[in-house]
Amino acid sequence: MSLDTKYDKFYSSDTGQPAHTDVVLNGWPRNRTEAIVNLPLTGDSILDVGCGDGRLLYQFRHRFKRLIGLEYSAVRLEAAKVQMQHLPFEGICGSAEAMPQLASNSIDAIVSADVIEHIPDVYQAADEMLRVLRPGGVLVINTPNIAFVKKRLRLLVGRFPSTSQPNEGLGSDVMFDGGHLHYFTYRSLSLVLERSGFVIERRIGFGQLGRLHHTWPSLLSVGVQLLARKPGLAP
């Protein structure tokens, strides 16, 4: 079974979901979606790398004129098109490792929630995201934090600290650990982005206990979230 077929099978439940609704922010962000939506991102165009059914991109419909979603799974992209049919949504089926449909220096902001851990070549994906961003453009990216305190404790007792599926990643018969190929800390994800030329501006912690997760994000945040910028000034 090919990888794209596995993803389509894994996410087949996305079809027929209720219409998207607005995320209600109440205090410090408690999950990956709130952590991105909480930031004051505005502009002409926004790209969601790994847009899924469009739930995150939907939150930016009043802040950007163009809503562009890149999604590897054709099943998930079709779900996004249904959800976003009355919005200026542009769906692209493909991988972040190669986005020939997008011109260089054409995007104001990129968001990506729990996607980079699925991408085989993370260096190429980072290079492509830098390429399509306009000078001064912003990338907001998050991924599970393998150094979260609960993960450290699981490893301490000899259990694999899986970040998607239970039972040490064996919870699905389709893909090991939900298709996660890589595991990141704040430092390692920062190094990947900096290698491509991004400048890291903020490291943001989030979780169910609110701001507490931000006091020591490398240990207490359930996810790694970075705000990075492409050097240069917008034309």
Predicted segments, located by residue:
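Conserved SAM-binding loop
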Residues: 33-152, 186-190, 225-230
